[in-house]
């Protein structure tokens, strides 16, 4: 129902964790490095689960999905916050960019402000800043490229493989003490 463009999928995940006040988040131990970092930046505790995923996975127990490797019709899960990536290596090769899909109007309004330094899409001297936001909006140039690419995007697309598969994040010193459940 709603789509909020961001500068990348990582910041989309961070904003979703912040919006929901995430306390403890469980993700696969093999995923992209910035995902657990975004969880830690949100102030949540991180846990790993050892399983192989395809296309997307949930940031458990929250209705947040990392869908960086999936972009196809009918993929949205009602009541969720689905985070997309438009990196040059992903389906929609904008170069840089991300998006949050949701059916929540309230969350959409919060994400729009959060991605834009906490302000509405007006000059900041004409606004009242109520939330602490980020400089995480998609540039107009990237948005224009994305709109152009969407004109010829197919309805049904297979999930992107990751070969070789992601490195086990527990091999990094930063994550060596993360509990595995």
Question: Where do the language-model regions lie?
Answer:
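PLP-dependent aminotransferase-like
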Residues: 14-74
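Conserved SAM-binding loop
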Residues: 5, 27-28, 100
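Gly/Ser/Thr-rich phosphate-binding loops and adjoining beta-strand/alpha-helix segments
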Residues: 2
């Amino acid at each position: 129902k709603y789509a909020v463009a961001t500068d990348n999928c990582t910041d989309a995940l961070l904003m979703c964790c912040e919006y929901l006040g995430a306390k403890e988040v469980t993700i696969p131990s093999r995923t992209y490095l910035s995902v657990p970092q975004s969880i830690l930046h949100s102030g949540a505790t991180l846990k790993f689960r050892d399983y192989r995923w395809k296309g997307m996975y949930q940031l458990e127990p929250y209705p947040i999905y990392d869908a960086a490797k999936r972009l196809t019709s009918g993929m949205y899960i009602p009541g969720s916050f689905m985070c997309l990536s438009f990196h040059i290596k992903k389906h929609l090769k904008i170069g840089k960019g991300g998006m949050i899909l949701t059916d929540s109007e309230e969350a959409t309004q919060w994400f729009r402000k959060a991605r834009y330094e906490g302000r509405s899409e007006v000059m900041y001297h004409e606004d009242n800043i109520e939330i602490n936001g980020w400089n995480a909006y998609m540039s107009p140039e990237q948005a224009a490229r994305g709109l152009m690419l969407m004109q010829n995007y197919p309805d049904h697309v297979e999930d992107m493989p990751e070969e070789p598969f992601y490195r086990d994040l527990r091999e990094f010193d930063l994550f060596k003490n993360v509990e595995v459940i």
